[in-house]
Every structure is written in structure tokens, then in C-alpha cells.
């Protein structure tokens, strides 16, 4: 038996999320069914990040074990043949037995896109958060600096989060404007349930002028979710990259080509 890692891209608009559910379409179930079609094996696929309903991915990483031996191209082409157009396998790699898509990861990176325009977009409404009021990204950038480093992110922790600790380490948070869209690029060692969306919701309150930049620092100190901003919609969130130790030879994401400066 061998262990295989896959790089997955998907439009999460049409799914209940990553995790398999009995009565709703999930990314996991489609991936597992495609594997079964080409190997005749029933496998369980493990992912780096269990994305919510409506959340997208450019750099999801998964792994599974199989007896089937195929070339890298045979895996990608074979699986994509049986996957819907909204899910795609971008690469396949054999990995050693110690690799785990979730527990071997050393960092995760998300991008959140806000369509900051008074007119909504018919094409972008499932891919962004349409926010009409003008957002000052300079204020948002200044506020975001308070989040860097290791902190207790309890104020950005959603109800139902099962993480033992709310301490996380943010490596970077960058905010840029691309035409009518604002891209919030955030990287950390790991994230709690809906943490990115809760951070975005709070930064938007700063950007629209409802709160001063230092309010973000106060939220960190208070450790109280009820004081922070709303949870931003799932539609604007993208899992773009998962990093691993170099000895696993996992390909990097291509996100720089798309949005980030």
C-alpha cells in the first residue's frame, strides 16, 4: 500500500463544505467517489483544512492510501474525468508514510475577496462579499498589524469551535485593492473555525469608519467574540496555500499569479 497526496481546487458554491454528509453534496464525497471509479477501492480522504459550505479552494491538500499504482498524470487525468467541473485535481504526489495532510502542515494561507462597489456583480456574487460602502484599506492595513504574531484570538473564535486553545501565530496579513475588489491575504500556523471570516468582518468595521484602528487591539485584549464584527460571508473566502516541511516535496500554490502583490 502507498500514500498519495493530491492538490485540489474547487468552487465551494455548490457544496455543503468539505466534510462528507449523508444528505448533501460535499467535496470529500466527490473526491472519494472519483478515486473509487478509477481504483475500485473505497478510501477515506484526509484534508488540510475542512472548509465550510460556500468556501472555495485553490490550494487544498489531501491524502489517502491505495493499492493502485498509477503515474502522476494518470491520477490527475483519471480523477478529473469523474469529477464535476467545479472540482479539479491539479497535481498528485507519492508521499512517505509519515505525511498527513492536516497534521504535517506548518502553515495555512487564505485570501478573502470583497467586491467594494455600490453596484453588485452578477458574475462575482458567489465568489466575493459584495460590500457597498467605501472601505479605506489604509485604515484596515493599520488595524491588521495588531493581529500579527502570537495572540489569543478568542474574540475571533466562532461558537462551536472545538480547538483546545485560541492561541495562534499570524505570519502576515496584507490588504490590497485590485480595481473594485479588496483582497485580504492572511497566513498563520493554523486557524480556528471561521477565524478568518470573523477577522475580515471586524476589519471591515474599521475600513468603513465605524471603529478606529486600535479597536482591533482592544478586541484581542478582551477575548470576547460578542464585541467583534460580524462573520463575513463564506462566498469571499479561499484556501490558497498549505505549507509543509520541504522533505515532503509538496508543490507550492500558484496564488501569486492571481491576486497577491
Curated annotation (Swiss-Prot):
The organism of origin for this protein: Blochmanniella pennsylvanica (strain BPEN)
General function of this protein: Formation of pseudouridine at positions 38, 39 and 40 in the anticodon stem and loop of transfer RNAs.
SUPFAM superfamilies on file: Pseudouridine synthase
EC number: 5.4.99.12
Record's keyword terms, sorted: Isomerase, tRNA processing
InterPro entries: PsdUridine_synth_cat_dom_sf (IPR020103), PsdUridine_synth_TruA (IPR001406), PsdUridine_synth_TruA_a/b_dom (IPR020097), PsdUridine_synth_TruA_C (IPR020095), TruA/RsuA/RluB/E/F_N (IPR020094)
CDD domains assigned to the protein according to its UniProt record, in alphabetical order: PseudoU_synth_EcTruA
The family this protein is said to belong to: Belongs to the tRNA pseudouridine synthase TruA family.
Enzyme active site: 52
Catalytic activity: uridine(38/39/40) in tRNA = pseudouridine(38/39/40) in tRNA
GO molecular function: RNA binding; tRNA pseudouridine(38-40) synthase activity
Enzyme's top EC category: isomerase
One Pfam family recorded for the sequence: PseudoU_synth_1
HAMAP family from the UniProt entry: TruA (MF_00171)
Protein residues bound to substrate: 110
Protein name: tRNA pseudouridine synthase A
Record-level GO BP terms: tRNA pseudouridine synthesis
Quaternary structure and interacting proteins, as annotated: Homodimer.
